[in-house]
Amino acid sequence: MIDPIDGTRSFVIGNPTWSNLISLNFKGNPVVGLANFPILNKYYLNFDNKNSFVFEQGKKRKIFVSKNVPFSKIKVSGAFHGAVSLKQQMKIPKVLKLMQFPTADALSYSHFCEGKIDVVFQTTNKIWDIHPLMPIIKAAGGVVTTWDNRDAVNAGNILVSANQLIHNKMLKLLKPVSK
């Protein structure tokens, strides 16, 4: 599966956060993932379901999500992309308070895999948006589901967290706006 330009709006305005996303799927499940950021001259890769790597400035580095961060100190990147009304957002004030970083499409998920961000949530992901990232996220140690705690393979509103404890707390906080 190929998403030739993930972050189309970023691409159009010249923001360097757009990417090329590629996944190899087997029986509908992503097994290999690549997130390439041409302008940033870096890419993220998982090809064995065991290890995820970032390649930058000619160097390969194994990446991991942050694991032992207390919930009170998590770094959250999120976006509603117009899919959750302002009225609905008012039902989740704790989530809004946690949001510290706007999402940058696939780059937010990639930074999550490096442990720079502890939680990423986005609405309206398509399968070509999330399939290439799922193997990278999982092999880096992350948890990835929909907001209603279903397998992310069918896309939709996606939540990724550094560990199951954080994930469960975020699912509970997002529940009022989960479909």
Which residue stretches match the model-derived regions?
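Generic detector of well-ordered alpha-helical packing
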Residues: 4-7, 38, 106, 123, ...
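Flexible, acidic active-site loops/lids enriched in D/E/S/T/G that coordinate Mg2+ and/or position polar
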Residues: 1-27
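Oxyanion/phosphate-interacting regions
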Residues: 90-94, 110-179
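Buried hydrophobic positions in well-ordered alpha/beta secondary-structure cores of metabolic enzymes
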Residues: 7-8, 76, 112
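Short glycine-aspartate micro-motif
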Residues: 1, 33, 120
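Acidic beta-strand-loop-alpha-helix segment within the catalytic core
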Residues: 21-109, 158-179
